[in-house]
Amino acid sequence: MDNLFTLDCGEILLREFRIEDVDAIYELTSQPEVYEFLPDWRSTREQRLDWVTNYEIPDNKEFLANVPSIGERWMKLGIVLKETDEFIGFCNTGIKEELSGPNREVAYSISKHYRNKGYTTQAVKGLVNYLFANTDVEQLNAVVLPRNLASNKVLAKCGFHLTGNIEIENQLHYHYTLVKKELMK
């Protein structure tokens, strides 16, 4: 656990994934409440172990090594309870290819057992603040299915503005943006 990138976000921390998180990530992404909105995250445990080991952990190291000029790199952080270090969700940033530039997005999910406690809002605000303060990012995006009411509320609480609709994989999504200069006013 030493030397892991960590952001203090109030009651929760955002921190780099570790191998020990694989079972928690697998359990989280196996919840129907999660894969309904993030089907690409559904996997076998073996796939998840491969992804965490060979992609997500190395991608995070590469992202952090290139701050402030992060380019098209991804960072995937676990949401953990500050008091117990229990892994309860994730909050990520990367490029959303379906959007025209600037197309850096934030994406997140939290276990059904920890919803409606403000943890996701704390995580998104923490990641947004980090990106705007420490990287060359000037605008962030999020795409959300209209029926994902909780996620739409999180984005509104974090200052994102609904800017339009976009079709992704034959489904209508709301497109939200947050511009650094507007947030810093």
Feature map (PLM): residue ranges:
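Conserved GNAT acetyl-CoA-binding A-motif
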Residues: 134-143
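Conserved phosphate-binding and hydrolysis motifs of nucleotide-dependent enzymes
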Residues: 89, 148, 157-159
